[in-house]
Curated annotation (Swiss-Prot):
SUPFAM superfamilies: KRAB domain (Kruppel-associated box) (SSF109640)
Gene Ontology MF: a single term: histone H3K4 methyltransferase activity
Protein name: Histone-lysine N-methyltransferase PRDM7
Residue ranges, compositional bias (Basic and acidic residues): 167-179
Keywords: Chromatin regulator, Chromosome, Methyltransferase, Nucleus, S-adenosyl-L-methionine, Transferase
Species this chain originates from: Homo sapiens
Keyword rRNA processing: no
EC number(s) reported in the record: 2.1.1.-
Function as written in the Swiss-Prot or TrEMBL entry: Histone methyltransferase that selectively methylates 'Lys-4' of dimethylated histone H3 (H3K4me2) to produce trimethylated 'Lys-4' histone H3 (H3K4me3). May play a role in epigenetic regulation of gene expression by defining an active chromatin state.
Amino acid sequence: MSPERSQEESPEGDTERTERKPMVKDAFKDISIYFTKEEWAEMGDWEKTRYRNVKMNYNALITVGLRATRPAFMCHRRQAIKLQVDDTEDSDEEWTPRQQVKPPWMAFRGEQSKHQKGMPKASFNNESSLRELSGTPNLLNTSDSEQAQKPVSPPGEASTSGQHSRLKLELRRKETEGKMYSLRERKGHAYKEISEPQDDDYLYCEMCQNFFIDSCAAHGPPTFVKDSAVDKGHPNRSALSLPPGLRIGPSGIPQAGLGVWNEASDLPLGLHFGPYEGRITEDEEAANSGYSWLITKGRNCYEYVDGKDKSSANWMRYVNCARDDEEQNLVAFQYHRQIFYRTCRVIRPGCELLVWSGDEYGQELGIRSSIEPAESLGQAVNCWSGMGMSMARNWASSGAASGRKSSWQGENQSQRSIHVPHAVWPFQVKNFSVNMWNAITPLRTSQDHLQENFSNQRIPAQGIRIRSGNILIHAAVMTKPKVKRSKKGPNS
């Protein structure tokens, strides 16, 4: 090719290049309205081309009727233009709820624009960052194609009030951050099935003579006296666990061994002591130790708490059984599968603590029964009830059997591990309430005859078998009981 020809053709090439530049500017005109002058000046041609292609794809999807997400750069500029329109206080535009909504992408886009301004021009060469910017998700519903065709202000007007709009955008962004919340920060809720109270979940108020759970409506929560802290395994733990104000000394009952005495001040009505501590076992032999209580875990399911071992028991093992109603000042009952003692009358200083779970307690609850005393050996009554206000009263107040009103005659008959033979059940009980538990079961016996001893021993209360819910359980009815001497010595 000759140099003359190349010189002739070069002017034509220059004219073509000059014509392409305005065409390129016109091609990016619809993109430039979404950016400020500063952003547009810093942007390279390949970025402009990419934004133009993104907008063309978006418009194509809207045209064919598909739902498409508006590109992030279009949303940002559109919001800035809307903010300028909202600044006019005297606008006659009709109010709609949608205009007052603060889209959640405002905060994100505001931070993104700041990041874009602060980034050097070389950082835009990273294609992955542009993908992230263009692919930013937003929550605005853009199915309405009319929104994309709304007229917008020219970029010159937007740049003049750009600083003011940014300040207002920053304020609204802070408001949006305060209102937005994360689903992961929701408070968790734990649900559990509500179970009905069990028969040993109830306590009894001696003052208003009514059952309650946790707290009496009239007199408040009950008072529990705590034992003195002593580690299990200490050889004299049972005596050292005695609460302040009480004393262990010789019992006032003739030849009954040691007992527990009140030495400080009056013990008020309804004061609770416990729980009774000892070795937990299901062995039937524990009933013969003289220091065990029978605890009901469920229907035909029992266990013993045996306080014979002084290193595992507490001071309650020394509490003796009352001989009659006048002596009784404590009531034994089961609460949450443990044995507790409750004062049924005020205990003055110098008085011995004597416990029983018999008919005195039944009379206080208004227990009634149509049962007459049995006439022969081997008949007994298994009398208990649930939480009703009208209950069955043990007829043993006649003194025929339980030993509380039996003649002691100086022989000091002991109530150790009473084993009742064949119980007569069921029996007719009048005036049972609707809430009464249907838990009348035969007595569990391990011997064919009643065993008692009348040696010179204490009168432990632990031989009495009780059931939960403050209710008397086993009351043996005997005539002319046979007794056997025990080889056990006095209580120590």
